Amino acid sequence: MKTTYVNATIVTMNEQNEVIENGYIIVENDQIIDVKSGEFANDFEVDEVIDMKGKWVLPGLVNTHTHVVMSLLRGIGDDMLLQPWLETRIWPLESQFTPELAVASTELGLLEMVKSGTTSFSDMFNPIGVDQDAIMETVSRSGMRAAVSRTLFSFGTKEDEKKAIEEAEKYVKRYYNESGMLTTMVAPHSPYTCSTELLEECARIAVENQTMVHIHLSETEREVRDIEAKYGKRPVEYAASCGLFKRPTVIAHGVVLNDNERAFLAEHDVRVAHNPNSNLKLGSGIANVKAMLEAGIKVGIATDSVASNNNLDMFEEMRIATLLQKGIHQDATALPVETALTLATKGAAEVIGMKQTGSLEIGKCADFITIDPSNKPHLQPADEVLSHLVYAASGKDISDVIINGKRVVWNGECKTLDEERIIFEASRYKRGLQR
């Protein structure tokens, strides 16, 4: 089926960051087959023409690091540093999860993401109390594009660790799909929660299955001190010594990196998921994204979980990301709007291995979102589109979300998830958690 979306202002995020006024996009099934300016002449003999009535159309946002299974934990453990937050609040609560609660929590996160303009994401979930197949089915039902990864820890006995490795390898073999809507990565939690043997096994699984790796790394000064004291190496060098960087790797955070480490990461195709709000809220610090980009590191913006953010609004992350770089460098030119948008769209897609999305160009997947500025005073005057998207817009402004050519959100209504039921069940399951 061919559908044309006409009368739109199109933010292409192509190589020229071209913005097309009064343009149209032609979609055939799941692919974009044309993007042009001017009046549509129906040269392609399309089946349906939809008038966007001047809406802004931009690529769907790509969240490079989150934990949607934790969505019921919003507001629990505020105003705490990372380690006590994990050890006294998050992990004890996650130990109470049941398969049904995990699905309800996941649905809430998916609903929030897709209604606020995120179309693709990379996720890590703690497998305790979780039916991994049910989580994957839930994500698939949402219509979103995702890399959903089972997190590995070295908690418990060596036998427990061995079993975790076996389960993770089965999971990777079952769900890894380089070009599909749903895939996975090998996901050791971090250097401070995984043994050397576990990290080495994760590296082996990634190499043998040709998958990517996703890990929390260099998130805090404490992590760097502890790893250096234990292994005689900083986290980057230690992770490399375990073989993790033999495959393209996404490190979440990268807050505490020096110049040599940034150069090393760029050389070894290690990408960074930048979580500005989460890093600020947990008191972890501010990642030097400007220096990362100058070193040649691929960077994508991310939200982390609602437990440490406390929302999944990628527009908010874009804005805080650019403002932080301007502030810490005392340089108003740091991370300009075009770069911020890139780090939330095509740049983010590249970070998590989804090059088929992230821009509105011929041959790309039909993943795009729309905003109607006509009834929004904070987006007026409406002629500075790129500026408004980064500095003024929010996820609440989203009208429509098309993923893989399908209308997942239309006129603000989610078509794939039951919003009323999800919100009701979220409250019901949250009450059952013992705090």
Swiss-Prot record:
Superkingdom of the organism of origin? Bacteria
Tell me its cofactors. Zn(2+)
Q: Which residues bind Zn(2+)?
A: 65, 67, 216, 304
Q: Does the keyword Secreted apply?
A: no
The record's comment on cofactor binding reads: Binds 1 zinc ion per subunit.
- Catalytic reaction list: S-adenosyl-L-homocysteine + H2O + H(+) = S-inosyl-L-homocysteine + NH4(+); S-methyl-5'-thioadenosine + H2O + H(+) = S-methyl-5'-thioinosine + NH4(+)
Which Gene Ontology MF annotations are present? Answer: 5'-methylthioadenosine deaminase activity; metal ion binding; S-adenosylhomocysteine deaminase activity
Residues the record lists as binding substrate: 94, 150, 189, 219, 304
Q: Which InterPro entries match?
A: Amidohydro-rel, Deaminase_MtaD/DadD, Metal-dep_hydrolase_composite, Metal_Hydrolase, MTA/SAH_deaminase
Q: Which N-terminal residues, if any, form the signal peptide?
A: none
UniProt keywords (A-Z) are:
Hydrolase, Metal-binding, Zinc
Give the enzyme's EC designation.
3.5.4.28, 3.5.4.31
What family does this belong to?
A: Belongs to the metallo-dependent hydrolases superfamily. MTA/SAH deaminase family.
Q: Describe the function of this protein.
A: Catalyzes the deamination of 5-methylthioadenosine and S-adenosyl-L-homocysteine into 5-methylthioinosine and S-inosyl-L-homocysteine, respectively. Is also able to deaminate adenosine.
- Protein's recorded name: 5-methylthioadenosine/S-adenosylhomocysteine deaminase
Organism, by scientific name, is Bacillus cereus (strain AH187)
